[in-house]
Swiss-Prot record:
Name of the protein this chain belongs to: Aquaporin-5
Native source species: Mus musculus
CDD domains hit by this protein: MIP
Annotated catalysed reactions: H2O(in) = H2O(out)
Span of the annotated motif NPA 2: 185-187
Gene that specifies this protein: Aqp5
GO process terms (BP): camera-type eye morphogenesis; carbon dioxide transport; cellular hypotonic response; odontogenesis; pancreatic juice secretion; protein homotetramerization; saliva secretion; water transport
Tissue: Detected at the luminal membrane of secretory epithelial cells in hindpaw sweat glands. Detected in acinar cells in salivary glands, in duct cells in lacrimal glands and in lung (at protein level). Detected in lung, parotid, submandibular, sublingual, and lacrimal gland tissues.
Length: 265
């Protein structure tokens, strides 16, 4: 775990999650600003969120994995894909990035267009219980899309993961906006709520629904549909951040050999 944290690549990845979430929140919320001359449409907002996540997944995905979502990060932790420490740093970076993105938009947008900065809220007589189910389903399909389209074990052509993920986010918004404003991402809900200081009694919905949905998708995908062949020892090593793939072990064999020889002398 110490080795992982001390690497430059680790902190590049954490910064990439911060930057990606900042940009995602800025563009997503920006598409929902209520300009007096032209109110946003459901289609406009849905496409904007989808384009934003697709663009960022393509641009910064190679650096950090392009989670940009605490629910996805926690699901990948449960799915034994990342270490506990990486998950903690990623979630912290995502939340700070969301606050920064919402804050920048608040500062730039005029008061007559700002509105409530697209803070998520229940609408159309949606109860908290129903809202949780809606967010669970929306995030479940998003998480499955992410896991499947980015699975390195797949040998068949998968197309563009960034495009698939962007379309999945767009799909979720086309349905979810009518119920909850569509979150699918606790950071997206948390950022504007902090900036506007508007935490409704139902704010928990935008944490519980997405996290449960993503975790259920991870359990289904990584343990039932496409289980990993890693041993229990290797699974523990992944969570601790000490797991080294066989390819890396071969690459570093000579380095280890020299170290052993020096120690022997």
């Amino acid at each position: 775990m110490k080795k992982e944290v001390c690497s430059v690549a680790f902190f590049k990845a954490v910064f990439a999650e911060f930057l990606a979430t900042l940009i995602f929140v800025f563009f997503g919320l920006g598409s929902a600003l209520k300009w007096p001359s032209a109110l946003p449409t459901i289609l406009q907002i849905s496409i904007a969120f989808g384009l934003a996540i697709g663009t960022l997944a393509q641009a910064l995905g190679p650096v950090s994995g392009g989670h940009i979502n605490p629910a996805i990060t926690l699901a990948l932790l449960i799915g034994n894909q990342i270490s506990l420490l990486r998950a903690i740093f990623y979630v912290a970076a995502q939340l700070v990035g969301a606050i920064a993105g919402a804050g920048i938009l608040y500062w730039l947008a005029p008061g007559n267009a700002r509105g409530n900065l697209a803070v998520n809220a229940l609408s159309n007589n949606t109860t908290p219980g129903k809202a949780v189910v809606v967010e669970l389903i929306l995030t479940f399909q998003l998480a499955l899309c992410i896991f499947s389209s980015t699975d390195s074990r797949r040998t068949s052509p998968v197309g563009s993961p960034a495009l698939s993920i962007g379309l999945s986010v767009t799909l979720g918004h086309l349905v979810g906006i009518y119920f909850t404003g569509c979150s699918m991402n606790p950071a997206r809900s948390f950022g504007p709520a902090v900036v506007m200081n508007r935490f409704s009694p139902s704010h928990w919905v935008f944490w519980v629904g997405p996290i449960v949905g993503a975790v259920l998708a991870a359990i289904l995908y990584f343990y039932l549909l496409f289980p990993s062949s890693l041993s229990l020892h290797d699974r523990v090593a992944v969570v601790k951040g000490t797991y080294e793939p066989e390819e890396d072990w071969e690459d570093h064999r000579e380095e280890r050999k020299k170290t052993i020889e020096l120690t022997a002398h």
